[in-house]
Amino acid sequence: MFHVKHRHFDVIVVGGGHAGVEAADAACRAGARTALVTLRKDDLGVMSCNPAIGGLGKGHLVREIDAMGGVMGCAADASGIQYRLLNRKKGAAVQGPRTQSDRALYKSAIQDHMRNVTELTVIEGEVADVIVESETVCGVSFTDGQSISARSVVLTTGTFLRGVIHIGHETRSGGRFGANRAIKLAERLSAMNLPVGRLKTGTPPRLAAKSINWEALDHQPSDDDPTFFSFLTKRVRARQIACGITHTNPHTHDIIEQNLGRSAMYGGNIDSVGPRYCPSIEDKVVRFADKVSHQIFLEPEGLTSETVYPNGISTSLPIDVQLDYVHSIKGLEHADILQPGYAIEYDYIDPTCLNNRLELQDHPGLFLAGQINGTTGYEEAAAQGLVAGLNAAFHAQDRDPLTFSRRESYIGVLVDDLVTRGVSEPYRMFTSRAEYRLSLRADNADQRLTPIAADLDLLTEERTSEFTAKMERLSRGYDILNDLVVTSKQAAAAGMSVNADGKKRTGAELLAFPSVELSDIAQLEPAVGQIDPATAKQLKIEAIYAVYIERQNQDAFALKRDEAKSIPADFPYSSVVGLSNELRMKLIKTRPSTLAQASRIDGMTPAALALILTKIRQTQRLSA
């Protein structure tokens, strides 16, 4: 039994994972009296899989969540023990901030934050039913018979709906290792005639740190100049560490191949589809048989933790085989397994039954966020939680809904992909999914989204003040640069490599040349030297991308204009250079008749559509 002061809320959030935390926080910031229902209060902020936040595409989502005043970015920075900027050698648009997190510190940061959220009541219990009257949601009931009411309900059930854990041929019920699954709620959703499917994900065995031969391994240190997730973070909060790097080898692969029949997936126990971009070690050995090794990152789970997460060897093989293949790997010859790897199957709802507010079209007031919508990853879940939580609050308050467009955010790309295309496998965010990715950079997430959050009164005074100060610094920087006008001859005399065309250029236009830095321009205008490093970096990025963004917008418009273009029945997809094997196989199988049909294929990206369009035009020119 549980006891609460109030039985009526504006919003009820079911589930306390990354989506649930973000949804509850967002609803409260929007002024809604909110109940967060979770099986165990102590599990708020638990990282069920790998102890890391961010990555390619994912890091953009975290920065956008933070720009909207969300929780994840600050928690990631409070617990970050190894910062890495992925794709560092590439342009800012496709760089991905990532941090290794201390599990305990992350959980503590989340719980500390949630304890101080006004209008929030956290309830321990298991929801058995969503109460619906005349197709409209009005609350939830619990397995003990009690109920609470609300105009909006957000379901963020993760992998708990009819969750089944597989370790070899052994199966057990569970929402994750050591946690019960949700059966009654899953049955209720099925009874509502929602389009329910099954997906799977997996996790590797956890290893004892003291049993690893660290001296035999390569090491990957943290970046010297970390890229933080929150725009409020000014310094590293935790001691930084290195991760170990090792590799599988032919002997490892032999052990796995010889025992494929004992794998839950290859032994026939699992029919559902797993994440393509996070395959199990069995999948890697089978699908990439030509590879003699696969990289493994040995990620400490915390500064004081004795557990190591071997990223790259998730599995559903039995424990004895896991031990054998782990011991075949350099540095892990005597490693102890603290928790076996496993696969988990769970129910999800086809997200095409949702609108772009993540609300069920046929059940006003019922919102879904996270893995229940067919996604994978903490970041994707948190982003959906933000969208669902805000819109659940606005629904309860009879306010206008908030939608995110593809043009302004990765959050918009994520939601649009889910509700228009659906999923056939767990969905993961990549920069290639965004046609406007040159302008949707991690560095400018606040410039794109914080004004929206400010208009909705979702921000703290600290965040509003920080953003205002940043924009004032940028404005002053642009004023200084635009007031400076020089000829190409003057620029060359100052050592700048620009076109010798006699054209006069502003300082901002000079900065667009890749080889020109603000320090070069400062030779002509001393005031430029007074611009702080963070502002200088932002000005440089924006100057570099200005021309490319205009071209990107033209390409996106052209792609939209040509959606009706026919694709020949015998179109040679195999000869389209740059097309991923995944999409090539899907296109050959489905043979879409127009670009519009091709765009609706699960996993299709704007970049891939552009490649197909270019090939169509090339083929037409050759046959003319």
From Swiss-Prot:
Principal place of residence: cytoplasm
Record keyword Lyase present: no
Locations listed in the record: Cytoplasm
Cofactor(s) it depends on: FAD
Positions that bind NAD(+): 274-288
Record carries keyword GTP-binding: no
One GO CC annotation: cytosol
Gene Ontology process terms (BP): tRNA methylation; tRNA wobble uridine modification
Described function: NAD-binding protein involved in the addition of a carboxymethylaminomethyl (cmnm) group at the wobble position (U34) of certain tRNAs, forming tRNA-cmnm(5)s(2)U34.
Listed HAMAP family: MnmG_GidA
Subunit description: Homodimer. Heterotetramer of two MnmE and two MnmG subunits.
Name of the protein in question: tRNA uridine 5-carboxymethylaminomethyl modification enzyme MnmG
Gene behind this protein: mnmG
